[in-house]
């Protein structure tokens, strides 16, 4: 009798631990001198509104004029915030880097209520596990996340986003910074034209 066929198995946690040679692609678009940083929580309705305007802002401003840096602002009252932020960071380590991370954010934004809790404390997601959230995001985004999510020291990138926000005194989402200064006069309710008017000429 011939040998049993080899079954491709997922790497063990020890194998993943031995290979932590990973890099999170910075969530940066454009390369202009004006730096527009936006701190977003992926399931926050106001963050979702702001996220939906970033492409239009970059198109209108031009990649030669503006650099957009997306910062992840996890918030504990959005109950699966930590899991979803880790999914976004995990996506950024994949071959397509920030494009995969953006696809994950767009998928969550498009189905935001399926990743939230009713009044932050109830609803169907009480029965959902972190693995269920990962699979749901994979289904909507087409991005395979589970293996990258399991990178043991992936939290160092998640912590960087947290520390960066804290050192800048940022606690809410969305928050906007232009050239290193918080702009309290900017909000998700503004039009792209309003944002453009607040950028340096």
Regions found by a protein language model. Name each.
Residues 7-17, 33, 113-124:
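Short N-terminal helix-initiation segments at or just after the protein's N-terminus
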Residues 4-5, 11-18, 24, 38-59, ...:
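C-terminal cap of thioredoxin/glutaredoxin-like
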Residues 33, 84-85, 142:
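Residue-level signal for cytosolic alpha-helical hairpin/rod architecture
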Residues 31, 74, 91, 144-145:
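A general structural-boundary detector
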Residues 37-42, 48-131:
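Structural alpha/beta surface segment adjacent to cysteine/selenocysteine redox centers
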Residues 23-32:
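Short beta-strand-to-loop junctions in surface cap/lid or active-site-entrance loops
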Residues 31-33, 65, 173:
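A general structural motif
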């Amino acid at each position: 009798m011939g040998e049993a066929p080899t079954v491709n198995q997922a790497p063990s946690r020890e194998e993943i631990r031995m290979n932590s040679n990973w890099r999170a692609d910075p969530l940066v678009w454009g390369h202009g001198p004006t730096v527009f940083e936006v701190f977003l929580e992926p399931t926050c309705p106001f963050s979702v509104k702001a996220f939906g305007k970033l492409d239009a802002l970059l198109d209108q401003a031009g990649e030669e004029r503006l650099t957009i840096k997306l910062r992840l602002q996890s918030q504990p009252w959005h109950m699966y915030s930590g899991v979803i932020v880790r999914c976004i960071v995990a996506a950024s380590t994949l071959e397509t880097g920030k494009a995969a991370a953006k696809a994950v954010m767009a998928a969550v934004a498009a189905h935001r209520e399926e990743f939230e809790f009713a009044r932050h404390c109830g609803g169907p997601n009480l029965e959902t596990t972190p693995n269920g959230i990962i699979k749901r995001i994979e289904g909507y985004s087409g991005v395979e996340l589970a293996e990258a999510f399991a990178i043991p020291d992936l939290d160092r990138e998640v912590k960087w986003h947290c520390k960066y926000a804290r050192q800048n005194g940022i606690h809410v989402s969305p928050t906007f910074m232009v050239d290193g200064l918080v702009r309290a006069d900017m909000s998700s309710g503004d039009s792209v034209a309003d944002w453009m008017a607040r950028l340096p000429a």
